[in-house]
Amino acid sequence: MKVTVLVRPKDGILDPQGEAIRHALDSLGYPIGQVRQGKVFDLEIDVETREQAEALANEAAERALANGVMERFEVVVA
């Protein structure tokens, strides 16, 4: 089963990469107010149900893919 895990900085956490991208876009004339850079993990999980896939992806995100102090994540089951 295909699962996507989206990892982003939590609100209020400094995002220097996002700020650098925002600055570059601004210098190119794009009126962007804020950019938050994150990570995307596309997983193929061998389970029977969507619920199992979501549970395993949540566990993997909490334990390995996201830093719970600085990042939040979202699991999307395809």
Question: Where in the sequence are the language-model features?
Answer:
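Long, contiguous binding/interaction regions
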Residues: 2-47, 52-78
